[in-house]
Curated annotation (Swiss-Prot):
The gene is ihfA. It comes from Burkholderia pseudomallei (strain K96243). SMART domains: BHL. Heterodimer of an alpha and a beta chain. GO terms for biological process: DNA recombination; positive regulation of metabolic process; regulation of DNA-templated transcription; regulation of translation. This protein is one of the two subunits of integration host factor, a specific DNA-binding protein that functions in genetic recombination as well as in transcriptional and translational control. This is Integration host factor subunit alpha. One of its GO terms (molecular function) is DNA binding.
């Protein structure tokens, strides 16, 4: 499912796919009405967000994995003063692309993730 890159994208800038554009693509390709397409995109991201909030990993076959990682406290430094300050422990979300997605991106192929 290819999409047209807007003509207004300045040279050198990477085009960005937004949630609104995802909904528009669903509208065009699947035949949902615009409201249903927008709701489906929102629901998809809500399910992923809820799973991550509950400490679960999210695995999307052929696309990649979202995982939580706990980073321990570590020493840091104020760049202006050079003063040593601790960087607090935190939890972060990481994304690891699948081998299939990596191959599609590397080969410059039009990704058809519905396969």
């Amino acid at each position: 499912m290819a999409r047209d890159v807007p003509a207004s994208t300045p040279a050198g800038d990477t085009p960005t796919l937004t949630k609104a554009e995802l909904a528009e693509l669903l509208f065009d390709s699947v035949g949902l009405n615009k409201r249903e397409a927008k709701d489906m995109v929102e629901a998809f991201f809500e399910v992923i967000r809820d799973a991550l909030e509950n400490g679960e990993s999210v695995k999307l076959s052929g696309f990649g994995n979202f995982q939580l990682r706990d980073k321990p406290q570590r020493p840091g430094r104020n760049p202006k003063t050079g003063e040593a300050i601790p960087i607090a422990a935190r939890r972060v979300v990481t994304f690891h692309a699948s081998q299939k997605l990596k191959a599609l991106v590397e080969n410059g192929a039009e990704p058809d993730l519905a396969r």
